[in-house]
Amino acid sequence: MKLEIENAVFEYLKKTLNRDLSAMLVRGHSTTLRPVTYIVVDCSEPKPFGTLSAADGLFELVLEIRIADSAHDIDYRIQQKRVNAVFKALENFECSADGISVLSFEFELDSDARDDDNIGDVLKYSVIAQI
């Protein structure tokens, strides 16, 4: 389910964002695979919702969208435009993964992020999905 939701969000952003932002989307979690500037979709492992068991088929996940640029020459006005565009695009997200129904897709927070020589934002969403 993790990979299916990651892929669904990735493909949704790929078709929804403008060409420049869409070109920044990368797959994978290794920093060596990421060109700067980048946008990465990362989903946590699903865990059964509340006190339910996995057999009940209702899961909660955390989805993070990382939007980063070089810490050496980031333009924060442009970075904020990127963040706003991704946030706006996800307002109407509907999961297209077969056999998975996203029941709730709620924005939780925007925080800063740093890795290697990059700096940026993380948009965090709470996801409840059913299989």
Where are these regions (language model features)?
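Charged, often glycine-rich, active-site loop that binds/positions anionic groups
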Residues: 34-44
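Short secondary-structure junction/hinge motifs that connect adjacent elements
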Residues: 24-36
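Charged, amphipathic alpha-helical segments and their flanking helix caps
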Residues: 1-22, 29, 43-131
